[in-house]
A protein has these predicted regions:
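Amphipathic alpha-helical segments that form the core helices of the histone-fold
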Residues: 34-43, 57-63
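Domain-level detector for trafficking modules
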Residues: 66-116
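Conserved small/polar residues in nucleotide/adenosyl-binding loops
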Residues: 142-144
Length: 144
């Protein structure tokens, strides 16, 4: 199967998976995601892609990158850039990649947990912005 057809969509999906990884994953989360990313070397729909992915994850293993969302997201970005370099395609900085995904999703993507930065004053300000304070608070929290 031609990776020029399925590859960009597949990378988009892998990045999206990393952006929804827990901020503070437990051991079970870490094991599930590790299994997911490692099993890909056997499932990619292109023999050469499978070989190259296997080589890349041996060179740059996922171990040590499962302690946080940011760490996993950066690992996926770095693996993606390694593949792009091998294929003579342009690479992007981590910041450029994140901005690209934020534009595509139309919202901020948090790699660090934003909740410690939510103050009581911010919550009060949000609640006063509408007659239905609870709805405003709920909507603001799900879009953080």
């Amino acid at each position: 199967m031609d990776p020029n057809i399925w590859g960009p969509k597949f990378w988009f999906s892998l990045h999206s998976v990393s952006f929804t990884y827990p901020f503070s994953p437990d051991a079970k989360d870490q094991e599930r995601y590790k299994t997911f990313f490692e099993i890909l070397e056997h499932l990619l729909p292109c023999v050469l892609c499978r070989k190259n992915y296997s080589k890349n994850i041996q060179k740059y293993p996922i171990d040590g990158h499962l302690d946080s969302r940011k760490s996993l997201a950066y690992w996926v970005m770095d693996i993606h850039n390694m593949v792009n370099m091998e294929n003579g395609k342009p690479t992007m900085t981590r910041e450029e990649m994140l901005e690209s995904f934020e534009r595509q999703y139309g919202r901020k993507i948090y790699l660090d947990d934003p909740s410690p930065h939510i103050t009581k004053k911010k919550l009060d300000d949000i609640a006063w912005q509408t007659e239905n304070g609870k709805l405003a608070l709920f909507l603001s929290l799900i879009h953080i």
